[in-house]
């Protein structure tokens, strides 16, 4: 299965754990694990809350090379 979201990678980049995110979101660690492995996807409202908690733009949770994406947009 192709990765749809980058939650696992962004958690790593922010030095946060899936257990931390589960606690902040009020869901089980198993639920966050499913999001991190892309075996299930959170709904849009949940994605927005995750982005807020991790202090990232929502696009960073989906675009693989977000920083490169931003640079390419600045050149346009």
What positions do the PLM features span?
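A short, Lys/Arg-rich alpha-helix, primarily the initiator
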Residues: 1-17
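Short, charged recognition helix plus adjacent turn
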Residues: 9, 15, 34, 60-76
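Short alpha-helical "recognition helix" segments of helix-turn-helix
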Residues: 21-22
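Recognition helix of helix-turn-helix/homeodomain-like DNA-binding domains
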Residues: 26-41
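Short, solvent-exposed alpha-helical "recognition" segments
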Residues: 39-45, 71-72
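DNA major-groove recognition helix of helix-turn-helix/homeodomain DNA-binding modules
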Residues: 45-60
